[in-house]
């Protein structure tokens, strides 16, 4: 993408309404623009980040055996009355009426709708288990939206659901999804810690939140440093081996981890002192097991092996995709701007032409741009070198390929790594090889 033809409106000054780092940098780097309280338009570079995060989520959900679906955003109030949540949910749920005066709602979550779909589609225990998910825009009318995309009213979210014949199967699905989430966050280049959580309005008796560690996080967190070295690869844990899932879950839940709200000083004292870590965290996901709460309320049954009708056991699993964007910036930035992890960066590299209009530098930049394709943002603007450097640091792509007239004359470029700040003068092929890794 050529920056001269792109809608990436960077800002030199910090907007007054931005209170935290991620909000300031997302506005300044041209990722989003606010449309109303807690509602944002995602501009091209921001949307690329959303897509990169969502694609990692999709790949890890597929590995875990979950199927992607897409449900409507507008739901019938009758479904929520079946479960008893229509009146109980609270004012954060947007209630509307259509032209025929039928009560509808903008779904903040989808337990009811998917239970109804399963009720109409699944009749026998032979059709279970099922795991399904979607990635969709949602709306919750926060009383005081703030902190940019971390506490918005409209947000992009992955919500998943499992249906099992019995408790043992439901627990296996829960553990499978916990492993999938930990692998998802690791691929995104961030460290996440699972912590026991309240179930809130979704209900149930088992839940874990996933917190990304960030100096500016909203919650205080206490955790065992052994979380930092847990191996999550296929060699360590196989989704199809129940013993592996049990071992993974036992390992995760045997280590101390708690937010300040649930911190237990007596349990914390039992953690070896050299393994105690304190910091701040941002919640980016939560998983729930709630048994037959919805299948009973909505009369969803299947015929069991003995011919008796049974209510399937359920779980639900959420990841805040748009929230992750802000959380990752909170965890990965410096005074100059964003430092994107490789896997989710909008571009792998910024190409900086320091002598726009010079035949040699222009030709070399075009060669690099053609070689990197859609992974590169080519700063071909008629702008000062200092402005280009500042914007490249602000936008935070992993690599900067700097092309000046002296290096270009020798067929060389300067390659800067955004995270470390390391610079090296390299020939074109060597620079491209590093960027492509």
UniProtKB/Swiss-Prot annotation:
GO molecular function, one term: ATP binding
Catalytic activity: tRNA(Pro) + L-proline + ATP = L-prolyl-tRNA(Pro) + AMP + diphosphate
GO (cellular component) term, any one: cytosol
InterPro entries per record: aa-tRNA-synt_IIb, aa-tRNA-synth_II, aa-tRNA-synth_II/BPL/LPL, Anticodon-bd, Anticodon-bd_dom_sf, Pro-tRNA-ligase_IIa, Pro-tRNA-synth_IIa_bac-type, Pro-tRNA_synthetase
Assigned EC number: 6.1.1.15
Subcellular location: Cytoplasm
KW Transmembrane (keyword) present: no
Any GO BP annotation: prolyl-tRNA aminoacylation
Highest taxon above the source species: Bacteria
Major location (coarse): cytoplasm
Any matching Pfam family: tRNA-synt_2b
Keyword list, A-Z: Aminoacyl-tRNA synthetase, ATP-binding, Cytoplasm, Ligase, Nucleotide-binding, Protein biosynthesis
UniProt record similarity statement: Belongs to the class-II aminoacyl-tRNA synthetase family. ProS type 2 subfamily.
Stored HAMAP family: Pro_tRNA_synth_type2 (MF_01570)
NCBIfam families linked: PRK12325.1 (NF008979), proS_fam_II (TIGR00409)
Record function comment: Catalyzes the attachment of proline to tRNA(Pro) in a two-step reaction: proline is first activated by ATP to form Pro-AMP and then transferred to the acceptor end of tRNA(Pro).
Quaternary structure annotation from Swiss-Prot or TrEMBL: Homodimer.
Identification of the protein by name: Proline--tRNA ligase
